[in-house]
């Protein structure tokens, strides 16, 4: 029960922290430190968390702590609490958003978080929103750059974007176990076309 409360606290902190976000800088190229060779047993049942806002939260000064009040890097802390899978959302051009996402969760940001998760032995899910911002039941807007595309052009853009992100991950040696196509798409996606 104590472990569940710790996981619930961390998940709540991540979710709550996403409500108080800041802007990213204009640099879209992540820096990848040397990979440390460490092996973790992350097999079996998937126990995961969506940490898509992590880099933005860290940029805003958020810190994460153990139950003993010792500061610890978030993904490492989640792993120590029993997590073995990470979900990361990817948007097409979040720089086009005028509200709250402004550059976070683009390909470079996702690569950086996936690289960190990979080095900790996490199983990784990539969630393609196929939008410049949140995609959920109330909004499934096409990316601004795709707004006037025909159905054929849209199909090609989806394929190209998906291949681009997954190829970039593969190039860094990052294995993706799951790919989620769209987010909360039970009413469709890529509106008004889809």
Regions flagged by a language model, labelled:
Residues 11, 46, 81-85:
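Conserved long hydrophobic alpha-helices within structured protein cores
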Residues 32-77:
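Boundary/entry segment of secreted carbohydrate-active catalytic domains
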Residues 8-17:
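Hydrophobic alpha-helical targeting segments used for export or membrane insertion
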């Amino acid at each position: 029960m104590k472990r569940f409360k710790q996981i619930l606290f961390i998940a709540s902190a991540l979710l709550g922290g996403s409500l108080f976000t800041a802007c990213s800088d204009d640099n879209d190229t992540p820096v990848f430190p040397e990979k440390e060779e460490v092996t973790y047993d992350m097999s079996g049942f998937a126990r995961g968390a969506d940490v898509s806002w992590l880099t933005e939260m860290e940029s805003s000064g958020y810190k994460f702590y153990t139950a003993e009040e010792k500061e610890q890097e978030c993904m490492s802390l989640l792993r120590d609490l029993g997590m073995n899978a990470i979900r990361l959302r990817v948007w097409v051009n979040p720089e086009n958003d005028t509200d709250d996402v402004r550059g976070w969760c683009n390909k470079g940001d996702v690569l950086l978080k996936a690289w960190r998760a990979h080095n900790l032995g996490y199983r990784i899910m990539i969630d393609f929103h196929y939008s410049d911002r949140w995609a959920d039941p109330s909004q499934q807007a096409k990316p601004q750059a795709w707004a006037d595309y025909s159905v054929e052009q849209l199909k090609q853009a989806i394929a190209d974007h998906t291949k681009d992100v997954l190829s970039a991950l593969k190039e860094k040696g990052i294995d993706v176990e799951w790919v989620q196509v769209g987010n909360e798409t039970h009413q469709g996606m890529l509106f008004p076309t889809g």
